[in-house]
Amino acid sequence: MTLAYNKRHQIVRPDSCLSVLQQRLKYARSELQESACYFVENVPVWPGAAAPTPFAASTDIFQHADCNGAPPLINTICARDNALYGLDLSDENFLVTNGGMHGLSLVFRQIKRRSAEAGSAVCLAPVFGAVPALLEATGYDLIYYQMSAAFPTVEEILAVCRADTRLVYLNFPHNPLGGIYSDAFIEQLVPSLAERGISLVLDMVYDSFIFDDQKIRSPFACTNDLSLLYTVNSVSKNYGSPGLRIGWVASSSDNVEAMAGMLEIECVAVCSPAQTKAASLISMGNAPLHQQVVSSRAIVREFLGRHLSRYASLPPAGTQVFVNLPVHDIEGFADQMLGEYGLVLATASNYSGAQGAHIRIPTGYPESITHNALELLRQGIERYADV
């Protein structure tokens, strides 16, 4: 449909170097300031009274950390992953990075170094747009597999792999769909890719947010040979702390050593105070943050049931719902919601391979913000949607 505006708000410029989301955020900060209602983040927000105050050493700014990461943080990360997934990894299997995306960049380049040519990489779609951008910048030819269920079959993934495929990138719990895979899937996928010499890169930055007592199995539990396996994680989503810019990669000790050498060349080491705070934060745990998401999910579930039951349902994991709205021009709708209602939304433009007029509804904001944002969204849908 063509939106019938009283006043048309065109906020996004197609010729901008910035992402659509970043343009809307800048508009909200400069034009709306405190009156804007931000409903974009898939980073969960700590409840005010429960917000942690992680410890920072008074002397850690005066020294470089180890290029692999500060030992206290690596010990903490290793203990976390071993406890969560029943593993027996050691500190040598972990590398601290400047966030999850930096970890992916190191992994993609390290895999490329194994071959004279980059070859191709398989991505499940939709996928956060920065991931394929990184792969293409590294020299890979991208192959998309369009998701039609919570997770694909192993046969479907293998069917799109080519003779030159170097890696398969998976993101579970999935961003933005919120799906998780079965034990049988990962137990079959790991040896199947290994037989073909294809690396598996598993992005697990939402693994704290799997609900209803469900779990996923780590690929490291499926083999003793870790040379073709990489997992990437961070404190941004799982611990609600994107400002720390702390992530980690797990793989074989040889792979970790190679990536540590790359990291040393690029930035010497990751920020020492951030690592100290991250170790403290992970040790404290994220139970209040998890409960915040549980509470917000209940509000979003009720909203979807009342207003959008034809278009989306609550997924089993993650911190958002990807909703295909009944509008023809989703970017025009999002601009109008921002200009007229002050509601900042993230759309399908944030993802590659997304089909349809999607927005993401976050499930990690405090209840009051969630209620307010959903009411504004209801008004906008009632006024502009093709229903």
UniProtKB/Swiss-Prot annotation:
EC number, UniProt record: 2.6.1.126
Keyword 4Fe-4S included in the entry's annotation: no
GO BP annotation list: amino acid metabolic process; biosynthetic process
Keyword Transferase: yes
Highest taxon of the lineage: Bacteria
Keyword terms, alphabetized: Aminotransferase, Pyridoxal phosphate, Transferase
Family to which the UniProt record says this protein belongs: Belongs to the class-I pyridoxal-phosphate-dependent aminotransferase family.
Role summary: Aminotransferase involved in the formation of the rare amino acid 3-methylarginine (MeArg), which is used as a potent antibiotic against the closely related soybean pathogen P.syringae pv. glycinea. Probably catalyzes transamination from the donor L-aspartate to 5-guanidino-3-methyl-2-oxopentanoic acid, generating 3-methylarginine.
Name the UniProt record assigns to this protein: L-aspartate:5-guanidino-3-methyl-2-oxopentanoate transaminase
Organism: Pseudomonas syringae pv. syringae
